[in-house]
Amino acid sequence: MIRNIAIIGLGTMGPGMAARLARGGLQVVAYDVAPAAIERARSMLSVAETVLDALGIALPSAGVGTVRFTDDIGDAVSGADLVIENVPENISIKADVYRTIDGLIGQDTIVASDTSGIPITKLQAHISYPERMVGMHWSNPPHIIPMIEVIAGEKTAPQTVATIRDLIRSIGLLPVVVKKDVPGFVENRVLYALLREAVDLVERGVIDPEDLDTCVSWGIGYKIAVIGPMALLDMAGLDIYKSVSSFLNADLSNRDDVAPMVLEKTSASKFGIKSGEGMFCYTPEQTKALQAERARKLVAVRRILEGRE
């Protein structure tokens, strides 16, 4: 049974993951090599806890469900039943983490990667116990979005998948078991298909970025939040889908490289909110207000989808 969890690498996702796991009654030790990252995570943790309160997710019993921060990786993984690796999307960096913890963790400890899309089979090549390694892909923001993908690599034991699936369910979240270890898994493959088409339409001057966001948020997104793609096909009618896809599919973007617009912006260090400019511009004040507004709206939507409003 999993009770003690180590999170290796805090970044954007770590604090929210830690907060949600702790709210489920689990003991969490959160590690990062950078003191600044730990301090930032402490601040983000309190914000995440406020959001969890708004979601009505009850506090666990006294003495359980705690989060402790450390800059000592050995301390972090000592006694851990589950280690969640949450370092940057780079196989070499992840492999370094696996080599470091290899001799520090117990023989029954499960190692899960929060990779957004690196095949788990590739990561298993860098660990001594591939049968105990699994993908555990959270969606951002992790303390609000309840869906978590569970992905087996070629050498992952079925029991490892079952253990992580059951853990996710036990704390009130929604596990989705991905049956094949494809790059990007499921969520990001669907998302990046949408983003590729969206960027292409803006780049070709078909629509302005603001109008595209309105179209998707109040058109596709408004429906998809309630009706999944497969159910939407049934609602619209497979005969209609057959007819439209017979001529539209050939005209959709099928580029297999990075769009020039994205390359131009990233080469100018325009990364989005984190740099103050991307597709749109953001002041520090706007960023803070935007993050609060988005969290509030996501909480409201989730409560409605759960039938609590």
From Swiss-Prot:
Optimum pH is 8.5. Gene3D superfamilies: N-(1-d-carboxylethyl)-l-norvaline Dehydrogenase, domain 2, NAD(P)-binding Rossmann-like Domain. PROSITE patterns: 3_HYDROXYISOBUT_DH, 3HCDH. Pathway: Cofactor degradation; B6 vitamer degradation. Optimum temperature is 55 degrees Celsius. The record marks 137 as: Important for catalytic activity. Involved in the degradation of pyridoxine (vitamin B(6)). Catalyzes the oxidation of 5-formyl-3-hydroxy-2-methylpyridine-4-carboxylate (FHMPC) by NAD(+) to 5-hydroxy-6-methylpyridine-3,4-dicarboxylate (HMPDC). Can also catalyze the reduction of FHMPC by NADH to 4-pyridoxic acid. PANTHER family: 3-HYDROXYACYL-COA DEHYDROGENASE FAMILY PROTEIN (PTHR48075), 3-HYDROXYBUTYRYL-COA DEHYDROGENASE (PTHR48075:SF5). Homodimer. This is 5-formyl-3-hydroxy-2-methylpyridine 4-carboxylate 5-dehydrogenase. It comes from Mesorhizobium japonicum (strain LMG 29417 / CECT 9101 / MAFF 303099). The lineage of its organism: Bacteria, Pseudomonadati, Pseudomonadota, Alphaproteobacteria, Hyphomicrobiales. The gene is fhmpcd1.
